[in-house]
Amino acid sequence: MNTVRRTLCLMVPLLLAGACASAPRAHPWVLLGQRVVDFHVDHDIIEVGRAEGRFRELRLVAHQGVVEMYDVRITLGDGDLFRPEGKLVLDRGEGRTINLPGDHRSVRNVNFVYRSLRGAGQRATISLYGR
């Protein structure tokens, strides 16, 4: 009986410490670049490079206007090309997350073919984040 009681007395603090430990926090998004988007169809490149680190996800966020994206091409560190499928329309303040293939990948650059939609009234800014 003393052995059971002693074992419980040792295990309870360990269990409580484990329950009180905070959950691991998600890595914050790192701003990789921004571009102002014109009303006509435009092409831009955001150079990223190995110095920025390795990423599992990229996130595109539209600011101050609505962006219509026709093509997004991501050149990975090893030269592989990744193209998320479909056309994207991002409203003001809206973002879209792109999961990169594989585990942590370095990114050389991201190519965009896009335009601001006139109905929003002003040119949009697109921000690229990684984590």
What is each of the regions a protein language model found here?
Residues 53-60, 102-119:
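Noncatalytic modules at the cell exterior or secretory-pathway interfaces
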Residues 63-86, 122-130:
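Short, surface-exposed beta-strand/strand-loop-strand elements in extracellular ectodomains
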Residues 38-69:
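Short, surface-exposed binding/anchoring microloops in extracellular/periplasmic proteins
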Residues 1-10:
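Bacterial N-terminal signal peptides that target proteins for export
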Residues 19-20:
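N-terminal Sec signal peptide cleavage junction
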Residues 33-35, 84-90:
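Solvent-exposed serine/threonine-rich low-complexity stretches and specific carbohydrate-binding patches
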Residues 44-49, 95-102:
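Exposed aromatic-hydrophobic patches
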Residues 24-29:
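Eukaryotic extended interaction platforms
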